[in-house]
Each structure stands twice: as structure tokens, then as C-alpha cells.
């Protein structure tokens, strides 16, 4: 029997195995940020332990950083403390830090790939659930808790059980104004937020092979929203072209050796998957969430389902809270729903490709009077590239705020937040209650959909503008 990509990655990193179920895996890359790292470092100090492989650990500030300016003195108390602690810890333990004033600082899941830290064949961990993003490169990447962060720092290993495997084959034609965000939202709707629990999901098919690395990262980024441990896409020529000449990518003869190895990182034709799903997206329309879970999704031209038709809920009462929270009703269409704020950013959709898609919508237009719209590049490198292309001017001239890199309004841990009852068109990954601010209402959409909502002042079907 052949092996899946997941099993090839897992097996090649086993340091110690017990009963063919639980293994200790070697960790190739450990990414850290200011929120989940402080307690781990404090514990190392208490136990008088050193970091096993400091050069395989990289840090950045992203969750708490202010995006208006770089003065952390204006940040809230806990955010300020966490950033100061990360700076001190990285200095004390000799860890490379892309701090708040570094020109390449950015969201950890944007920074890692664009610097070439993320490479095919690796096992990658970070104290952040959206570490699954890096699986787009054919790496086994997953989020870990703070106690596990400490363990990896101390040993460069981590105990992991073997997981089940799922293959989602995506076929068909990608329609105009349909993006990777729409594809993954539609898949989450189909599988639900629990459909991937206990699995590593490998995405494949003719659609995946056409996607850029930025789009593949969007797909893998949100695999966690199905409950999956990680998402995977086998590396190919698109992967290699993206990685070539990156700061940490192999160089010269090592590059050729790497390509030879990376070419083996694909599931064998006779590999067994515990579950296989095939999805044709030829009829897919732009997607939008209507509730408070990422699987509460509809097409922009589709009404919110009636209670009786929602099989994902065990009883009708379970639907009342999200609709009440969002101020919506069953049967309602969202294509004229007024928005208060628009957020284009996050580790899901803050790369140059995402900003181009949004800029293409807003060029020679202006943000509606009722809307406050911000664009937050995912990193300093993304910001620089966008400015070289003139994207910043397109956004600024259209009435958007052009911000500094950071996680920003994806989560209410910094100064960018929704006020109670404010409705936001957001390119982020989670629409939980209070995620973007207390009592804020979040609708997940693609960058193009968010940009259009900013211009019209309400959601629209971007295929018709």
C-alpha cells in the first residue's frame, strides 16, 4: 500500500515511536509570537533550561501590535507587556526576532513563507491555530499550546498521535470573481466546523494545481475551521518558483538537491485515505457568512436558510442565537445588508495578491460615507511590494486607511476593534461572537467582496458590478 503525503512527513520525523500510535516528532521550524510565548519562557527559566535549537526558532510581533503607528506605549497594558516580554525573551535566549520596528515584521503566517523559512517536507509548529497555513507548501504544520511551546523550545521535539487522513479533491472551473476564500468557505459549509476533527486534510485536484501559493495558503489557513489538525497541498513547480531566492531557501547546489527531495512529497497513487471527497466548483458563487460560525455560509445570491432546512443544527433553538446576535432573519438576502466597517487583512487574506484583488474593485471609486474601511498588509514586505505597485495610493484615494502590518481587526487583542452592533465585512477567518470586538458582527468574505462592500456601503454580488 502506498503512503499519503501526511504519512511520509510524519514517518520521516519520528524520533521515538510507541505502539505505532504515539510518536515523538522532530520539529524543523518553530515560530513564536508575543501572545503564547511568555509563560513558556518563564517556565524555562524556573527549570534552568536552555533552548535546544535557537536557530530553528523565529519570532515576530503581530497579534497586539498597533497598526496606526509603532508606538507600543499607546497599546493597552497587557499588549504592551507581552510585546516587551517577547523582546526580552528573544534577547536572553538568542532568538531571531522581527520586532515591531523591523522593516520585515509581519503576521507570523505571512512572514514565515515569504522569508523562505517555510519549506516543503518540514514539520512546523507555532502557538497559533492557523499554523495550518504553512501546509500549502507540503509541510506538516499545526498549532500548539503554550506548554507545548515550552517543550519544543527545550527539546526541539513534540509528542503527536497519528491522525486520520482525508483527501478533498477540488475540480471544475473557477468562475470570474470567485476566489480561494470562496472555495474554502464553501467546503467548510459542506463539511461543517466539526467535519475535519481527527484528520489531516490534503487538498488536491485540477483547481488546486492552478492556484497561486497565496491562494493555497488561504485554503490551508482555514482548514482548521473544519476542525482539522492541519491542511496539506503537495509541492509543485508553483511552490518552487515562489520559494526560489527567498532569504532562507536553499541556494546553489542545495537548491537542486532540495527540488529532488521535494518532488517525492506527494501521496502515492495507491495511497489509502480514511475519507475521500470530490467537490466540483464550476457553479460556485461568491460566499459570505451569515452567522457566528465559519460553516454558516451562503452564496451572495442565496437567502439565509429557513430553520427547518438547516441539517447542521440538532434542533431549531440552536439557530436562534446566531441570528439574534447578527440581527438577521431566516430567508433574508444579504446583498443589500448595510455594513459599518470593512477590514482587509489577517493571515488569511493580507498578501499582495489579496490586495491586488481588492484594489481592482476600488480603483477610481470611493468608500461610502457610512463605512470606515482599513487595509492592513500582512507584513512589511507585502506593504513595500504593494506600495511599489501603487496599491496604497489606490486605496488611500478611495478613502481607505492604509495601515502598518499586524493582525489588526482579525481579533480584539489590539486597538482595531468593532463597537457593539457594528457590522463588518472582513477577510479574516473567524466570525465568532465578539471575535472582532464585544458584540461586533462579522461577515467573512473575500478581499474583492469586502472592497465592494466598502464602496457601495452594503454587500453586493461582485459578479454584477
Curated annotation (Swiss-Prot):
Cofactor(s) needed: [4Fe-4S] cluster
The entry's keywords: 4Fe-4S, Amino-acid biosynthesis, Branched-chain amino acid biosynthesis, Iron, Iron-sulfur, Leucine biosynthesis, Lyase, Metal-binding
GO molecular function: 3-isopropylmalate dehydratase activity; 4 iron, 4 sulfur cluster binding; metal ion binding
Gene3D superfamilies for the chain: Aconitase, domain 3
Entry EC number(s): 4.2.1.33
Function: Catalyzes the isomerization between 2-isopropylmalate and 3-isopropylmalate, via the formation of 2-isopropylmaleate.
Subunit structure: Heterodimer of LeuC and LeuD.
Name of the featured protein: 3-isopropylmalate dehydratase large subunit
Gene this chain is encoded by: leuC
